[in-house]
Amino acid sequence: MSEENSLDVYSFEKENREYFERNLPPRPANYFGLEGFKEITRELLTEQTNRDVYMHLIRDSQGMMVGRINLSVLENDRTTAELGYRIGENVTNLGYAGEAVKLVLDKAFTTYGLNKIIAGTATGNLASQRVLIKNGFTFSRMIENDLHIHNEWVHTAVFEIRRP
């Protein structure tokens, strides 16, 4: 991600806000105001410069943004990162998530010097779990009552993969 393509991210997040909030905790309110988004983006780009996070956009063959994928390096273990990704509602089940995870894992282990990647999904998010398993992740543990979404507590299934 860069400042130049941050408006693509802003549009993508706004267009898919309701879809994402069905299964994920909502973003802060200021995230969807342009000035708030710009401020958050500046902070994220600083984190990226400091190698605290690696952010990538997922684009289709025509260059349209269809998703995003991030690696957030853990503060207490700089060789481990948490994987997160979002695919737009209109392009789910087309293979973008699987391919993006495959590509970012390669970068994580060969370019970024990471040794372990962890990823959490809501226990009901079977599609995301399939993407992780197809890319070599294994189930690690369950975190009960981890996320509060729509006034309900949701359990998280945690997966991990280590450098080959």
Regions found by a protein language model. Name each.
Residues M1-D8, F12-R22, M55-P164:
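Acyl-donor (CoA/ACP) binding surface of acyl/acetyltransferases
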Residues E3, K14, Y31-K38, D52:
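Generic alpha-helical scaffold signal
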Residues E21-R42:
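Conserved GNAT-fold acetyl-CoA-binding loop/helix
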Residues A29-N30, R42-H56:
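A short helix-loop-beta-strand connector motif used in the catalytic cores of GNAT acetyltransferases and
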Residues G36-T49, R68-E75, G136:
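Short, charged low-complexity intrinsically disordered segments located at boundaries
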